[in-house]
Design a protein with these regions (language model features):
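Substrate-binding surface in catalytic domains of secreted glycosidases
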Residues: 26-30, 59-78, 139-219
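Bacterial N-terminal signal peptides
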Residues: 4-14
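Glycan-recognition patch characteristic of GH18 chitinases/ENGases
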Residues: 20-123, 198-214
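Sec/Tat signal peptide C-region and signal peptidase I cleavage site
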Residues: 15-19
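An active-site-proximal structural segment forming one wall of the substrate-binding cleft
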Residues: 114-136, 158, 180-184
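Loop/turn elements at helix/coil->beta-strand transitions in domains of secreted/extracellular proteins
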Residues: 20-25, 45-49, 91-97, 131-136, ...
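Short acidic catalytic loops
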Residues: 50-54, 128-144
Length: 219
């Protein structure tokens, strides 16, 4: 009996450790929430991956950054560069990765132009190098046509080509927008899927599960 109990205890511990090793928690960090004290240091330290959602692409591939007006009061952080430094101090001693997040802006026009895609990827790499960040997350909402999916996929491939394997590269997709090319899927380290829920009011369990399976079936 002792041997049986020991075996099941060993199995339980092993499964628990496996689950912990294969669980990866990413969190977006916005300067306005941080300055208002709405993000605790404990929450930051509990994350494996923190994404500073601070940059927007312009149509030519240049970058625009979060409006300085949001950095007011609170912790005294006055720019997104200071936000990175402050959060880096908050998570000192952990293995938390710090990454840049790109969203919104003129992304559809940018990904539609080959020269702009190249410029965007190179500009992102410069920011990562300058601020000693661990990678980039793209949260472009949303591609709506076959051409937009194709252009977005090409931008993803170009980003990986420019960054190489040194940086962590992810994209955030959604149940209404997930059909990037198989080559683009293979080019990223992982994909976050904005499948919210389950919630009995807006996102019932059946819808939550079907949305997940839909993306998995796609590949």
């Amino acid at each position: 009996i002792f041997l049986i109990l020991f075996f099941f205890l060993f199995l339980l511990v092993g499964l628990s450790l496996y689950a912990q090793q294969n669980c990866f928690i990413s969190s977006y960090v916005r300067g306005n929430f941080y300055n208002r004290g709405r993000i605790s240091a404990e929450s930051l330290r509990a994350s494996d991956d923190l994404i500073f959602l601070n940059v927007r692409p312009n149509k030519d591939g240049s970058l625009s950054f979060e409006n300085p007006r949001i950095f007011e009061n609170g912790k005294g952080v006055t720019s997104w560069e200071e936000l990175i430094k402050s959060v880096r101090a908050d998570v000192k001693g952990t293995k938390t990765k710090l990454r840049l997040g790109a969203a919104s802006g003129e992304w559809k026009a940018m990904v539609a132009d080959e020269a702009a895609r190249v410029a965007f990827a190179k500009n992102i790499k410069k920011i990562l190098e300058k601020n000693k960040l661990d990678g980039i997350d793209l949260d472009f909402e949303w591609a709506e046509t076959e051409k937009e999916y194709e252009d977005y996929s090409l931008a993803i491939l170009k980003m990986r080509e420019v960054l190489g394997d040194k940086y962590v590269f992810s994209v955030s997709l959604h149940p209404v927008c997930y059909k990037i090319s198989k080559e683009a899927i293979a080019a990223v380290d992982f994909i976050s899927y904005q499948c919210y829920g389950p919630s009995p009011v807006r996102f019932p369990m059946e819808k939550y599960c079907s949305d997940i399976q839909m993306a998995l079936a796609y590949g």
